Amino acid sequence: MMNFLRRLLGDSNEKELRRLQPIVEEINRLGPEFAALSDAELRAKTDEFRQRLADGETLDDILPEAFATVREAAHRTIGLRHYDVQLIGGIVLHQGKIAEMKTGEGKTLVATLPLYLNALEGKGVHLVTVNDYLAKVGAGWMGPIYHFLGLTVGFIAHDQSALYDPDFIDPDANPEDQRLVHWRPCTRREAYLADITYGTNNEFGFDYLRDNMAYEKSQLVQRELHYAIVDEVDNILIDEARTPLIISGPAQKSSDLYRQMAQLVRQLRRSSVTAKQVKEEGLEPDGDFFVDERTKSIYLSEKGIEKLERLLRIPPGESLFDPEHYEKTHYIENALKAQFIYQRDRDYMVTPNGEVVIIDEFTGRAMPGRRWSDGLHQAVEAKEGVAIKNENVTLATITFQNYFRMYKKLAGMTGTAYTEREEFAKIYNLEVVVIPTHKPMIREDLPDQIYATEEAKFNAVLREVQEMHEIGRPVLIGTTSVETSERISAMLKRAGIPHNVLNAKHHEREAAIIAQAGRKGAVTVATNMAGRGTDILLGGNPDGLLEEFLRKEGLTIETATPEQKRAAWEKARAQTEAEGEEVRRLGGLHVIGTERHEARRIDNQLRGRAGRQGDPGSSRFFLSLEDELLRRFGPVDRIKGLMERFVDSDVPLQAGLLDRTIEGAQTRVEGYNFDVRKHTVEFDDVMNKQRQIIYADRKAILDEADMRERVLDLMAEEIQRQIDEHLIDGFEEEDLTNLLRAYRRINSTLPASVTAETLKGKTKEEIEQYLLDHLETTYAERERAVTPELMRTIERRVMLGAIDRQWVDYLTAMDELRQNILLQAYAQRDPLVEFKRESFRMFDELKQNIARDIVYNIIPATFQYEAYLRQIAEEQARRLATAQTVSSDGNGEVVRKPQRRSTPQIGRNELCPCGSGKKFKHCHLGREHELASLLNAQPSAPPASKALKSTPATQTAVAEEAAKIQAAINSGKLPPTQTTPRGRQAPSVPRGKKR
């Protein structure tokens, strides 16, 4: 039926391509005209386009000319000219869609077209890749095009930011790779101010979070999120969609409970009855716990709970789930997952220095620096017996889903997106357009071979590799885990077949190994998508063979002359071209998949390594009924029974029915994972709206020069709240006393002489006005004491500090809410509706807590800075006294005498000599005359606080030092204001019970 409708109505993708064809023809028509322009005339097109945009034309109006300009500039600078299909890809990207372009079709070159066009608006455009190397190489390779046309190009990495400058030579870069040598270091802000910025998804996201933790406007690096092209868009927006970016800080130290629970769960026995049988057939588990492999969840049986209660020595009559023991369930759950679900060399690896490093499920790459949250990483560390690192508290977090949806226009490109088009449309509002290849695809995708056991499958893989290796065809073997890649490597070694292994443990030479995987007789074992972004050239890459040819001549990259390098490169090129032709005659690259992935597009990515740009090639998947996908989602038992009865273990099945079964299993998993991600984004959207409100408030505080009135308004609201709380109709003296006690928590300068008696006889309105007048007077005095300029900074710092402190607590509370809210489903309530209701209530509390945090800390914060000012002024007063005190010796001559200090030099953080037990800065700093009396010594000068009031010179010094403090704050040398010795923690609005 669907095929009939497609024939009747036409394929929507073909319609879209036909619609774009006239634009391509217009660009081609402009080709000769632009080819006739001089370099200067072609370069001047950029200014012309900018002016036309300023005059009211749109990007669509100038698209044909802009694309023709880039095409000609690319031809003149890097010797590449965009094909028509690449022009189509560029138009699709400009329109904010996803362009599916097969491996080797030149996505890096395609991106130059929409990047140039959209950069003309002057708002900054981003090219997002999956790793630093691809970002730097891509920007450096295309850099000459942008530079020729007068655009600036920036690059950001984890520990580097730079601008493309052809006149700059990086002494530390490989001089043979021109893509890497012309990067001039710059600040991160400068890299973002470039017309075009290349970087990774992680760095763009983390910079956004860091910007929203900044305390000064000068610390911001990103501009408004305008336009981005996401390379490998399926990897970033789908595979990584549920992975949140988290900036964290240290929390409490890790508990010994992790090690204790790791030992306890080893004594538990897994049930042979599966989760599916428990749910669908009502069977009872025959062990202490059972595993739902589909959701990667673990459930304790009644027997298991009783066993744990015995092992934990919980007293009779009490339960593991009682409040006093409930905390342990969190550790038990993580210990069970670490022991029975997360496998070493599949989900993580342990480095030689004892660090647990996560392995990316989709790429097989190690991800150093990333940690599982919520205690899972600590549980795995306890399982492996390595050092357990402290838990962290989340300071800021965002998912890729929410970060990339903030761009005004978003586009993406990848080799495999069509199977996920529904998800791209529903979550990101992105349409997928399949771009035709420049040359016809002639790769042969052979039928799957399915074996009963894993052992039979791997034996068949070995036989196929031997056959291909004997005739000289290069082979790429794709695996789903480090463990599998090492198992195959061991088999190849025993068979005497030379090969390269590329997995999380051997990633250093990733690009080099993949680039040479197309040489004659090469055998490469790689985990999923390793080397993605690097083309496999049949015959090999001459750049990678350069060192080998130089070594034969007794030379190295460093010692060879340019002429020797050029000669060696020509030899390498000739060899790779000849070898490439031979490999093509043999049939090209043969790709072997050792297991089907949950997502069909991951399988397609592996197949896509062969047959690039019209080259010959082939692919085949070898499967077994013991593979995880079939075990979890396929009707294994029925098929296995048939195979055991009718087929020898070494004979594969190639039935079309099984192919449909496998594809059906993959479709079900894709649907399930889509639902999970959709469910995740529905919950995240609630948090995202709240994040946007908080971050917008932070930005307003950074942008606003004077927050005085806002702070006073917050204080007035808090006083009103205190009066409403304490002074109910017919209030008594005790109520007035409680009110004054509450007010002094905001403003401790209220004289002790002000008592309930002072306020007796006044109305509520008169009392409120009395306190407001006193508060405003105090505020004005504090402002004079620290100078108005510094007061503005104190206001900003206290407000930002309050937002950040309360936001961190809120993130923790929301995380707990999200974990527990799913229990609402058991009460026949929609968890999402309940989550929204509860989170809105908590968000109102958050706003109240932020306001009260500001109110209770603003005045104490001024004393913190004034104490610092007093210390500086005191030192200046003493220096003045030492230099200028004079006396007569009786002969009329003036004798200069040094002014002696009658009290010893005391550091601010030393204990005060008065014996109070407090630090000097919290006790007698500024009241040295009192301290001198206590120590039976007369002070040599009036106290610094008096000198500040009486001496114009020291008042000037205070203003100068205030300016210095302001400068230090702006440069990040002084920390944000937190609570102070005189300050008190603001009372929080109760959030309800925590788990």
From Swiss-Prot:
Alphabetic keyword roster: ATP-binding, Cell membrane, Cytoplasm, Membrane, Metal-binding, Nucleotide-binding, Protein transport, Translocase, Translocation, Transport, Zinc
Disordered: annotated segments: 883-911, 939-995
Recorded topology in the membrane: Peripheral membrane protein
Protein's organism: Chloroflexus aurantiacus (strain ATCC 29366 / DSM 635 / J-10-fl)
Protein name: Protein translocase subunit SecA
Function: Part of the Sec protein translocase complex. Interacts with the SecYEG preprotein conducting channel. Has a central role in coupling the hydrolysis of ATP to the transfer of proteins into and across the cell membrane, serving as an ATP-driven molecular motor driving the stepwise translocation of polypeptide chains across the membrane.
CDD domains documented for this protein: DEXDc_SecA (cd17928), SF2_C_secA (cd18803)
Family membership: Belongs to the SecA family.
Binding site for ATP: 86, 104-108, 535
Annotated EC: 7.4.2.8
GO biological process: intracellular protein transmembrane transport; protein import; protein targeting; protein transport by the Sec complex
Enzyme class: translocase
Cofactor binding description: May bind 1 zinc ion per subunit.
Biased composition (Low complexity): 957-969
